[in-house]
Design a protein with these regions (language model features):
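C-terminal functional extensions of proteins
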Residues: 167, 177-220
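Buried hydrophobic positions in well-ordered alpha/beta secondary-structure cores of metabolic enzymes
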Residues: 81, 170-171, 209
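Electropositive, gly/pro-rich neighborhoods at or near active sites that engage anionic ligands
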Residues: 1-79, 87
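Long, charge-dense
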Residues: 94-138
C-alpha cells in the first residue's frame, strides 16, 4: 500500500537538501539576480517554511551580512528574545567565526527571575524588561528577535534615541499585535538589519537566518 505514495525511503540527507534547493530555484523567479550572500539566507528561510512568498517579504538593509560576519569574527555577544532561539543556535557553527564562542555568549533574559518580578511590578511585558536588561551589551551585538515585537521595538528606540548600534538586527517577531508596527519602526533605524515584513516570523526563522549568514564563511 505505501508504494502508492512514492515515498523515497532511501534518500540520503544531502540528496534531499539538494533536491529541495533545486525545487526552490526552479520556482522562485529571479533568484539569479540577487546578491549570492542574501540568496543563501533567503533560500534557507524558504526551505525552512516551504513558503516561496517568504523571499518577497525579506528586507536586507545597511549591508547586514558583512556587518554580522565581521562582528562574529570579533566574538560579539548575541541577544535573543526567546529561549527557543538560545537553544536552537549552534555553538559549533558560531565557532567557525570565532573559536571562543560558548552558550554563555547567547543572552536571553526572558525567563530570569528578576525580569518576571519587574514585569509584574511595572505592568509591562517581560520582553520589554528583558531588552532593557540587555542594554549594556547591545552596541555591536547581534540581535535575534523571533517572538516578541515589543522587544524589537524597544531595541529600535535605543538605536533611534540613544545611538545604540547593533551589528545586526534580525527582526522576525510573529503575531497580530505590534508586530507590523515594530518592523516598520526598525526599518527607520540606520542599523544593519534583516526584517521579514508583515505578521509572519518566529524563533525558528531567526535561528535559520543567523545559521545561513554563517554559510558565507570560507570553508575551513
Amino acid at each position: 500500500m505505501t508504494s502508492e505514495f512514492n515515498i523515497r525511503w532511501d534518500m540520503p540527507p544531502a540528496a534531499i537538501e539538494a533536491e529541495s534547493f533545486a525545487a526552490i530555484e526552479r520556482e522562485f523567479y529571479g533568484w539569479e539576480e540577487l546578491p549570492p550572500a542574501e540568496w543563501k539566507v533567503m533560500r534557507r528561510l524558504i526551505h525552512t517554511t516551504a513558503d516561496l512568498s517568504i523571499g518577497e517579504g525579506l528586507a536586507f538593509r545597511h549591508d547586514p551580512i558583512p556587518s554580522a560576519l565581521e562582528a562574529l569574527r570579533r566574538h560579539c555577544p548575541i541577544f535573543c528574545d526567546s529561549n527557543m532561539i538560545r537553544a536552537g543556535l549552534s555553538v559549533e557553527r558560531l565557532r567557525r567565526a570565532h573559536p571562543g564562542y560558548a552558550r554563555e555568549d547567547i543572552h536571553c533574559h526572558i525567563s530570569d527571575a528578576d525580569i518576571a518580578e519587574q514585569a509584574k511590578s511595572t505592568g509591562r511585558t517581560r520582553a520589554i524588561c528583558a531588552a532593557e536588561k540587555a542594554r549594556p551589551i547591545l552596541d555591536g551585538a547581534i540581535v535575534l528577535i523571533g517572538n516578541a515585537p515589543l522587544s524589537l521595538a524597544r531595541i529600535a528606540r535605543y538605536a533611534l534615541e540613544e545611538g545604540i548600534r547593533p551589528s545586526l538586527i534580525v527582526g522576525m517577531p510573529v503575531g497580530f499585535v505590534n508586530v507590523v508596527e515594530s518592523k516598520l519602526l526598525t526599518g527607520t533605524c540606520p542599523v544593519p538589519q534583516i526584517v521579514l515584513d508583515g505578521r509572519r516570523g518566529g524563533s525558528a526563522l531567526a535561528v535559520t537566518t543567523l545559521h545561513a549568514i554563517l554559510e558565507n564563511l570560507p570553508a575551513s
